[in-house]
């Protein structure tokens, strides 16, 4: 357990909530990159970007609450916004998924509002990748498209009884 390792390294025999939080973030996002020197303009950009995610999450509300916003680099990220679900669910509504996509674009929107269209950065690349993947899943596998309706569009037909081809 990563939390126990952190407590032991600190010379403690009990695991604290801070140990568990740090362990969870380390596993999810990677270790803190404390030695990374971040220029002031980049810190400012990261701060606005992450707060953009937080603001969209706060305004949208819904099932995930903003738990933490940080500019401390971890893994490949310059900072991150951690949202936690209020309850665990096996299935997600279309609204929930669209809200999550909006949250992913909150960082890019903040960059554009604060710094202008010509000064947006590559910092949103992972956000765009994840949001695009979610949107593709919604349309091609989950039948959540207004245009196509409840159909499977990814080319597989696992449910075909006779595996016949459709021409």
Where are these regions (language model features)?
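Soluble catalytic regions of large protease machineries
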Residues: 43-48, 54-167
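Short pre-active-site segment immediately N-terminal to the catalytic Zn-binding motif
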Residues: 35-45
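Structural motif detector for alpha-helix initiation sites
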Residues: 16-17, 94
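Hydrophobic alpha-helical transmembrane segments of multi-pass inner membrane proteins, especially
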Residues: 6-9, 26-33
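Short, conserved phosphate-binding/catalytic loop or strand-edge motifs used
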Residues: 21-26, 75-77
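Residues within well-ordered alpha-helical secondary structure of globular protein domains
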Residues: 2, 26-29, 57, 137
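C-terminal helical "lid" of AAA+/P-loop NTPase domains
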Residues: 1-9, 21-22
């Amino acid at each position: 357990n990563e939390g126990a390792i952190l407590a032991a390294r600190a010379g403690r025999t009990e695991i604290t909530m801070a140990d568990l939080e740090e362990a969870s973030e380390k596993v999810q996002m990677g270790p803190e990159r404390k030695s990374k020197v971040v220029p002031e303009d980049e810190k400012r950009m990261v701060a606005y970007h992450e707060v953009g995610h937080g603001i969209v999450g706060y305004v949208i509300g819904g099932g995930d609450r903003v738990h933490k916003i940080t500019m401390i680099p971890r893994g490949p990220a310059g900072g991150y916004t951690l949202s936690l679900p209020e309850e665990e669910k096996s299935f997600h509504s279309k609204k929930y998924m669209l809200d999550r996509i909006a949250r992913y674009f909150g960082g890019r929107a903040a960059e554009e509002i604060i710094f202008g269209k010509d000064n947006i950065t590559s910092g949103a690349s992972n956000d765009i990748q994840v949001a695009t993947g979610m949107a593709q899943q919604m349309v091609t596998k989950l039948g959540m498209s207004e245009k196509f309706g409840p159909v499977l569009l990814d080319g597989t037909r696992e449910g075909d009884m006779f595996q016949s081809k459709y021409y």
